[in-house]
Amino acid sequence: MTNLTIGISTGIKDTQMSPGIIPCAVLSAEFIKLCNKFEAHAVIFPPQYNKPNFSLDGIDGLIVTGGGDIDPSHYNEHPSDKLERVSMDRDLTELNLLKKAEEKNIKTLAICRGHQLLNIHMGGSLHQDIPDAGFKDIDHAKPYENATKHIHEIEIDKNTKLNQILKVETLKVNSIHHQAINKLGDNLEVSARSSDGIIEGIETTNNWDAIGVQWHPEYISEDKASNDLFDWLIN
């Protein structure tokens, strides 16, 4: 199938522009390249400041991307002092995207922060900081400069959609996150974990076709697994 339109969420980042440093909606071009590789068009959904509720009419697939931490008020917790780059505008925009995608059964790939937000949308919660939660065997919070490197392995449950897509039971992934899923949301199952027990993959068990992955496939876009995920989303 060709000529599909994939909606991709993004955040706001202070960026050097001609007038100086100003807040801009930014997205890794790797997302666009991967969509175009499978003959799909990419459109961007930045955070909305006053109207987070908008339509997904004309959108065939959704990617909810990585970024800063999610406000813990969305899962009824007080904020940890380890939180970084929280944006309520982005939270509300992306939660609305997930709500609309579920209502319309739009195929969804949720990445890193998006994977965590998918869990929150389904009623789950997060570990606000992985080391504080007692997980110290793997350093999951590698600097952004290591985004293209394979940091650790994950194990994929063979009875899951993720396994059917990737056709492997172990996979080496990158890792640039300090938060992780705690309580699993409703109508979700765990598809992958790292050896320390951190949830690295989730997927829906209801009629909505949605997958969350804790790693960043767009930064290791030459990997077969990354291409298989985008092929699943688009085709």
Residue ranges and their predicted role:
Residues 1-109, 120, 127, 131-165, ...:
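N-terminal beta1-alpha1 cap of cysteine-dependent amidohydrolase-like domains
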Residues 112:
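Conserved G/P- and acidic residue-centered "switch" motifs that form tight phosphate/ATP-binding loops
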Residues 115-118:
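Hydrophobic, aromatic-enriched interface-forming segments
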Residues 211-214:
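Active-site-proximal beta-strand elements of phosphoester/diester hydrolases
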